[in-house]
Amino acid sequence: MKPGWILLFAASLMTAISVPATAATLQITMDNLVISPSEASAEVGDTIEWINKDVFVHTATARNGDFDINMPAKKTVTSVLKKAGTIEYYCRFHPNMKATLTVAP
């Protein structure tokens, strides 16, 4: 193998190794007083798009205190997951609206 090709191969290998993984975006919807999906999985660093399709204000309030997201009617709010774990959350205004989010490290 020619020295130039070795350098090119090494440079492309280093680029592939050093490129961080791209964070994902997960959509969670509040519609007709239901959270969908009711069970979701994500990773630390991922973004959650909380989409409120209802005419009511909703929250996504973690029972363990990890987050408390306020969602005005007919609006979308985003947040970034900062901590791993299984999080049960609900709407403070409509306590029957509940779901679980599992966040991997």
Show which residues each predicted segment covers.
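Extracytoplasmic copper-binding redox domains, predominantly the cupredoxin/blue-copper superfamily
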Residues: 2-8, 18-105
